[in-house]
Each structure stands twice: as structure tokens, then as C-alpha cells.
Amino acid sequence: MSIRVDGRTILEHVNASVSEGEIVTIVGPNGSGKSTLLRAMIGAVSPAQGTVQRASGLRIGYVPQKLALDAALPMTVQRFLGLPKRISARDAINALDIAGVPDLRSRQMTKLSGGQFQRVLLARALLENPQLLLLDEATQGLDQPGAAAFYQRIEQVRRDLGCAVVMVSHDLHVVMAASDRVLCLNGHICCEGSPNTVADAPEYRALFGSGTKGTMALYQHKHSHSHHHDHHHAQDNTN
């Protein structure tokens, strides 16, 4: 798959797939095409070449990079979760519980901390019981312990729902350790594999240095499950 925006090539010859129950992290420098790849996966961006193939009826949950709310507009968490269509209190509580914040339903959105706000965005993405959960810089603005706690919750969500997870992040040492597979992107896939494999790859070290590997051990993810059936596949049909 290749993507061009305003005549400029953003992604070129990307071939990747996501399997059921798998946690995949996309890392790369600013401008490397990470968010563009996620937008292509949800259908918001069309490839200039190649295709994005989705499993029939695939349910996708999406947590955006940023969401600005008018501070002067009163809005409870329940009301926010019910946009654009209302949901029951039971559904809201269930989604918030899975996201790890069961007591926020009546709180004002503008009164939430950064970590709470991100958990509510996660709850909103979980309302449709997704088979594929996409997170674009979901911990932006959180401190390191907050980011680590968020990614631990994502692992729990994967266990509870059995969904595949694709994350874009700059929290390299935290998010890579929480992953089954890492894609290092810089306009194309530079390298991919297990977190340790990618951390040792010369292409990765050329972009990020060698400091990631030691800190990854603090948040090591346990690979105790298997992955079956591709949910999503991006393919470049050009030669």
C-alpha cells in the first residue's frame, strides 16, 4: 500500500497485517506516516496504490490523538459517551468499567484529569465491542507512570475482549514492552518483529539510538497467547 497527500508520498510499499488478539505497536519519528497508516486502516484515507483489506463486518474502535472540548459547554461523561446516539447507563458503566474508570459516569468532562480523559475516550471506543482497537498517541500528555498504567489497561482490555490492538506512540520503552509485535515506520516499514528484535535492529537504532532496550524491561509484556486469523491487511499491489 502507498499513500500520497497533496502530491507528496507519505507511505510507500507498506505490507502489514494484524491478527486476532495481537497487540501491534507502530513507532517512528514525526512525519513518518504513523497516524496516516491508522487513518487508512479505518478508511479515512484512500491508498494511491494497493489495498486495505478488512475482515467482513469488522468492528473497529478508535481512540484519537487529540479531542478538544469547549470548556464552557457542560457535558457529563454519560452524555459524551452517548454522542452521536444515546446509550443506556448500563452500557456506559460497562464500557467505563472495562476502561478502568467505573465511577466517572456523572463527572463533567472538563473536570477530568488527563489520565481520566484518556480512559473515557477508551471507553467510548469500546462501546461497540470492537474486534480491532486503534489508538493514536493515546497517552499524549500523560506522565510515564500514567502511560504505563494506561498500556497495562490496554493489555487487560485485550484479554477481556480478545480484540486486536494497534497503537501509535512515542512512549517507546513503555509501549514496545506492552506489544507482541512492533513496526518501525519512516515512510516505509524499516524493520518489524518482537520488541527486542526491533530494539536491536540497526534501522531502529539509527532513528532512536540504543537507550530503549534497558528501560523496556521495567514494563515487560508476557507473551502467553497465540494469534490467529488476520483481521486487517494492508497490501501493496505494485511491483
Model-identified regions with their sequence ranges:
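H-loop (His-switch) and adjacent beta-strand-loop-beta switch element
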Residues: V182-S194
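Catalytic Walker B motif of ABC-type/P-loop ATPase nucleotide-binding domains
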Residues: L133-D136
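Helix-to-loop junction immediately C-terminal to a conserved catalytic motif
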Residues: I42
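Conserved ABC ATPase signature
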Residues: Q108-L112, Q116
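Conserved ABC ATPase "signature" region
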Residues: A89-L104
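H-loop/switch region of ABC-family ATPase nucleotide-binding domains
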Residues: S169-H170
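ABC ATPase nucleotide-binding domains
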Residues: D200, F208-N239
